Amino acid sequence: MQGLAATTTNRGSLTFLAPRNHSPISKKFVNPRVFFPNVDSSAKLRLSASSISRRCPREIAPLSATASVDFAAAATSSNQLFANGLPPLAPGLRRHRRPIEPARVAKDDFFKIKLPKIAERPEWWWRTLACVPYLISLQISDVGFYVQPFLEKHDAIGDMIYFIPGAINRWPTWFFMVYCYLGYMWVVKNKELPHYLRFHMMMGMLLETALQVIWCTSNFFPLIHFKGRFGMYYWMAIGFTYICLLLECIRCALAGVYAQIPFMTDAASIHTLFNLGGFQRPLR
């Protein structure tokens, strides 16, 4: 600690550290010229206190390598003297730095809609009613028309067409429009009904709508539009995928849980939890 001096007073135990060039003691009480001969380091730290004691009651104690300095008292005194401009001294010599934490990957759930938690399992009649929208979606869909060329080519599974709802007996075309309007207004937006039932009702209508969107967009591809080998296998894959999705949704409805399908689950949650469009009551 080169260039520092520990200063003490006779009236109180006030000890502080200050540079030699900027000592808090007035210069008229301290002899500014102090010469150190070419001796060892311990002799360089000794000061002649006799010359200073005649003029000033304060003494400058020598600061050696083995000397013990009360840093707590020095910090207290420095806070009292330099409270206006300088920050307080640390009680210890070593600063405790906060360890640098490694970077972690945080899961981003900003665009995810959280579904309400089902505390108790719904009653059996609610679970049965939740399966009806999926059966209606299978009945009014064109799945039987999609898989019919593939089943007719293979005689072993040709009779399977009779077990697919909607393949033989088709409902009128206006039924889908009436069903979607009444189901959306009376069931999905009805807050008095359980959210579990409203969610599965909306999920069934969204799956049927998605199948119609796929049918309209697929007609732009020539190899799929015409009844060829590639088109037969393509529509067979679309039809059986739709049937598997409906069976999975029916399983979730009977189990009393929400069906987890990418994009469809969030869309059904938005329709059941929020009011999109229409006339709403103004906020007060």
Curated annotation (Swiss-Prot):
Record field: transmembrane: 131-151, 160-180, 204-224, 230-250
Gene disruption phenotype: No visible phenotype. Tic20-I and tic20-IV double mutant is embryo lethal.
Superkingdom, natural source: Eukaryota
Cellular localization per UniProt: Plastid, Chloroplast inner membrane
Keywords linked to the UniProt accession: Chloroplast, Membrane, Plastid, Plastid inner membrane, Protein transport, Transit peptide, Transmembrane, Transmembrane helix, Transport
Tissues expressing the protein: Expressed in roots,seeds and non-photosynthetic tissues. Low levels in leaves.
Membrane topology: Multi-pass membrane protein
Keyword tRNA-binding: no
First and last residues of the transit peptide: 1-48
InterPro entries xref list: Tic20
Biological-process GO terms, alphabetical: protein import into chloroplast stroma
Keyword Transmembrane helix: yes
Chief location category: plastid
GO cellular component: chloroplast; chloroplast inner membrane; mitochondrion
Role this protein plays: Involved in protein precursor import into chloroplasts. Partially redundant with TIC20-I, but not with TIC20-II or TIC20-V.
Family classification: Belongs to the Tic20 family.
Subunit comment: Part of the Tic complex.
Protein name: Protein TIC 20-IV, chloroplastic
Gene that produces this protein: TIC20-IV
